[in-house]
A protein has these predicted regions:
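Alpha-helical segment proximal to the catalytic Tyr-Lys
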Residues: 42, 86-90
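A conserved structural motif in NAD(P)-dependent oxidoreductases
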Residues: 123-134
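Catalytic Tyr-X3-Lys loop
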Residues: 15-35, 49, 53, 77, ...
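Short, small/polar-rich loop/turn modules that mediate ligand/substrate recognition or access, typified
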Residues: 89, 94, 149-151
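Substrate-binding pocket helix/loop in short-chain dehydrogenase/reductase
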Residues: 12-14, 21-23, 108, 116-119
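Active-site helix of classical SDR
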Residues: 37, 73, 81
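Short C-terminal tail/terminal secondary-structure segment
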Residues: 11, 62, 139, 150-163
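Residue(s) in the substrate-gating loop at a strand-loop-helix junction
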Residues: 57
Length: 163
C-alpha cells in the first residue's frame, strides 16, 4: 500500500488559523493515513505479509513556519509509521515512510509564490524533488530486497535534513 494523503492547508500563522482549517488538514493528512493503514492490516496479517509506505514530509521532522497544521499532521504520520512498524513486525508487515522535501505536485496549487520560493531556498540541492526519484525509493522500500526495515523514515530532502 502506498499511502499518500496530503493537503497543504492555509499558509497562516497559528494566531490566524481557525480550528476548522486545523481539523481539515489533520483529517486528511493524519486521519486519512491512519484509516488507510487500518483497513489493510487485517488482510495483511491473514497473509502474514504486507508492505505499507506512508508519505510524510520533511516538514514533519523540522516544521515549517506558517504551516503548523501541515507540519504537525506529517509529524503524526512519522510517529504512526514508527508505531505500526513495531506493532506489525511480528506479522511480516513492514511499515515505512518517506519524508520528502517539496516536489512539484498539485499541492503547489495551494501555495503562494513566496512560500514556494521559501521552500526552495531551504533545499541545499537547489531544486525540488522529482517525483520519479521518490517513486524509485518507494519501489525499493516496499520490495522484498528491503525485507528487514520497518518503522523506517527515509529522507528525501535534498540535504535539508541531515540528521
Amino acid at each position: 500500500v502506498i499511502n499518500s494523503a496530503g493537503i497543504a492547508g492555509p499558509n497562516k500563522t497559528v494566531e490566524d488559523y481557525n480550528i476548522n482549517d486545523w481539523r481539515r488538514v489533520n483529517r486528511v493528512n493524519l486521519d486519512g493515513t491512519f484509516f488507510v493503514n487500518k483497513v489493510c492490516i487485517t488482510d495483511m496479517k491473514n497473509e502474514n505479509y504486507g508492505r505499507i509506505m506512508n508519505i510524510a514530509s520533511i516538514a514533519g521532522k523540522e516544521g515549517n513556519p506558517n504551516a503548523s497544521a501541515y507540519s504537525a499532521s506529517k509529524a503524526g504520520v512519522i510517529a504512526l509509521t514508527k508505531s505500526l512498524g513495531k506493532e506489525l513486525a511480528e506479522f511480516n508487515i513492514s511499515v515505512n515512510c518517506i519524508t520528502p522535501a517539496a516536489a512539484k505536485t498539485r499541492i503547489f496549487d495551494q501555495m503562494s509564490e513566496d512560500h514556494i520560493s521559501y521552500m526552495l531556498s531551504k533545499i541545499p540541492r537547489g531544486r525540488f524533488l522529482d517525483v520519479k526519484e521518490a517513486a524509485k525509493m518507494i519501489v525499493w522500500a516496499v520490495s522484498d530486497e528491503n525485507s528487514f526495515t520497518t518503522g523506517g523514515v527515509f529522507d528525501l530532502s535534498g540535504g535539508r535534513a541531515t540528521y
